[in-house]
Amino acid sequence: TQPNPGERFIYTNIVEVMGVSETQTKAVQTGGLGFGPFISTALEAGSSMMAIAPSYVRRGSPAEAAGLRRGDLIYAVNGTQLTTSNYRNYMTSLYQSPSGSYKFSFLRFEDNGEGGYSLNAYESGTAMSSVHIYDPVLHASILTDPDNSSTKSGYLVYESFDLNSQEFLEETIKDFAEAGITDLILDLRFNAGGAVAQSRWLSGCIAGAANYSKPVTKVVYNDNSTEDWKFDYGYSNDTDALGLPTDLGLDRLFVITSYNTASAAELVISSLKGIDFPVKMIGCRTEGKNVGMTVSETTYSGRRFQFSPVTFWVRNAKGWGDYKDGIEPDEYVNNDNTLTTDDADNVFPYSFSDWGNMDYNIALQWAYCDITGKTR
């Protein structure tokens, strides 16, 4: 269920810049263990023993190197059992994890070969909280229909539109193009936005060369001046330095969304709908951030600050941009209400297994079945 449906946010912000700013480096580094936010569960009814499962584990992170995956049920950290009295602290500390060395005891659902799953126990390697290269591609794979080998579906889980991580996105799109995918399932459930330029580039890959000259978005600034961006190069020839998109040869898009999906992620959906490119949304209503910020930096008393005031809002080719209350999906996996009994997946957008397991990734299963014509 969506926390606080209809809640509004103030997006303008001021932050102090510590160390090297993102605008001064090409390779973006991040710290910590590489976990996403956690979901919790009781290990057994009537017991105080708890487990927490990460929403994702970033590629190339210390947590991945230690053997952890999305959905693994961590029940002990450095030998300390998680209980009702301490698990919340671990949910916060492991997500932020500014420093430290960790070993995890965890359970993993695995195919038992009999049409079901076994819950198997594992011990991780040592994970040292450390600086590592940030990769917003949380998962990428190609799903092939065993009954029709010509049907190939690219599945991309993308966390953030980060210009300095463009190489990771380009590599994934190149792999999809070389494999000749016939459909794309774009999972934006944990994507809160980022650079409009990269959103434009990915939208162009999906829309294809036949639509390059069409408007991807109209940017309307606070003084009512406007910029018309196109799918090919954005505002003007190669302004954003990303170049022409890679034409994936698609004629539709399946996109998975949640209440985390916002800003530049919502722009992909809006821009494609603006040119009547078929988009099917599965998941739950998006956040509803149809405004953007321009980042500037200043120094005061020897300290550097970044100012990010809201300076523009966006409209698509049809003039539509009124999604401040979010964009509603075509099919709800998890309803925007306080109930769990009417949800197809009552822990969405979280999971207790890895990305590719459709038994635990209902949104992916629905998209895949729509593509292949199989029964859900």
Language model regions located:
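Flexible, low-complexity junctional segments that flank or bridge functional domains
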Residues: T1-L184, Q198, G208, R376
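C-terminal "post-core" interaction segments
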Residues: G154-L156, S165-E171, D175-D183, A192-R376
